[in-house]
């Protein structure tokens, strides 16, 4: 989002990754954002955002006001990457293993119950 760098396997850390698809115009994304901020404090987890069909200036302003939980933000202006992932709408959250294989997918906003009951057991494996 901030640079035009191409993402490669070398950009992924050797740890589990939360991949979150979001947009500044998405009200449900705002509802889940504080939970993503909390998850980003866990140093055993990497967090990557996919900014979906959004204007860069709007997305950067949104993160500036609310905090940026992502180590990397991928701009998906027309939704091609998200379509390849099978995204139905935003927000959607994935957990990738250390080899970038999808282990978990959640459609809709995450909350504390989803984190505790569904995500943390996978993240702690």
Across the structure, where does each feature detected by a protein language model lie?
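A short beta-strand-turn-helix
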Residues: 1-17
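C-type cytochrome heme c attachment motif
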Residues: 24-31, 92
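Short pre-active-site segment immediately N-terminal to redox-active cysteine/selenocysteine motifs
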Residues: 15-17, 22-25, 89
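Hydrophobic beta-strand anchors of alpha/beta hydrolase catalytic cores
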Residues: 18-19, 47, 93
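Nucleotide phosphate-binding site architecture
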Residues: 27, 37, 103
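Structural microenvironment flanking redox-active thiols in thiol-disulfide oxidoreductases
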Residues: 30-67, 77-83
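Thiol/disulfide oxidoreductase modules built on the thioredoxin-like
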Residues: 64-69, 76-123
């Amino acid at each position: 989002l901030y640079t035009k760098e191409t993402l490669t396997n070398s950009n992924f850390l050797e740890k589990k990754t939360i991949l979150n698809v979001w947009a500044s115009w998405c009200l449900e994304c705002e509802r889940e954002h504080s939970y993503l901020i909390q998850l980003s404090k866990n140093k055993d987890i990497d967090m990557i955002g996919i900014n979906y069909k959004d204007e860069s200036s709007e997305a950067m302003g949104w993160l500036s006001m609310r905090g940026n939980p992502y180590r990397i933000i991928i701009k998906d202006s027309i939704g091609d990457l998200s379509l390849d992932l099978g995204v139905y709408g935003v927000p959607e959250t994935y957990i990738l293993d250390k080899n970038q294989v999808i282990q978990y997918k959640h459609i809709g906003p995450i909350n504390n119950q989803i984190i505790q009951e569904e995500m943390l057991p996978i993240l702690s494996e």
